[in-house]
């Protein structure tokens, strides 16, 4: 039984050591494909793999078609839009993610981004505090819950909207549940985005929604760039000199947005899960899920049908 770890952006050594211990301890073989630059290297490596672990690497229909023995693929992280779920299902491959393993890392980054932007990117003599501000959490999953926990430490008033999370589950955490996404944006000084990129959410964060936000508003995006209507973001920043946007996913129109100076910031690459702890947690979770699936048929975190 061969487990392939294919990562253009490799795991930390400690994560690989842990993955190896889990995989080989279960009696399986571990193979590594790291820092590959040609997708053909991926095709060749996956050809005889029974299980696959990736990070942000794209598991396309073509990858799946080259993987003649593949039974399971695990995306080490919460988002799984880099997996072609239809292709996996067609080839009877179980696709999983590892929810919750990087949620604290993303939450800490989101909170840090709020401070950075409220201090006008650390411009001396200016800025404001988070204490007393209204924070809206758009999607109350593992990351959203951690953002709420951190924000309450700053003394923020926390609101949340999640169409799939019961009101009671939100409010038991001391967070105010609102009835619609429009209400969330109309109410809050800051909105922290945690929605996945799906056909329903792509470009759903548009001008009409953003323009509901109060004066001096900030949008923090540690989710996916695809959920932002990028042309509308330019329009919003142009029409509302009080509005700010920060993201850890550089948009396609980044150069257009830099004209807005300290009201816009994007990290040079996706940073939410870029901590040693998150890297290790997600890698070990992926390895454990593969072993549990192969040995016991456990499909708890399956994301395809």
Placement of each model-derived feature along the sequence:
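Phosphate/diphosphate ligand-binding glycine-rich loop within oxidoreductases
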Residues: 31, 50-127
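C-terminal helix-to-coil terminal segments
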Residues: 2, 7, 13-18, 25, ...
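Rossmann-like adenosine-cofactor binding region
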Residues: 60-64, 165-259
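Structural motif
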Residues: 6-10, 34, 56, 222, ...
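Phosphate-binding beta-alpha-beta segment of Rossmann-like dinucleotide-binding domains, i.e.
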Residues: 90-153, 160, 168, 297-304
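Phosphate-coordination loops involved in phosphoryl transfer and adenosine-cofactor binding
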Residues: 70, 131-134, 216
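N-terminal glycine-/charge-rich "phosphate-binding" loop or analogous flexible N-terminal tail
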Residues: 1-49, 157-159, 255
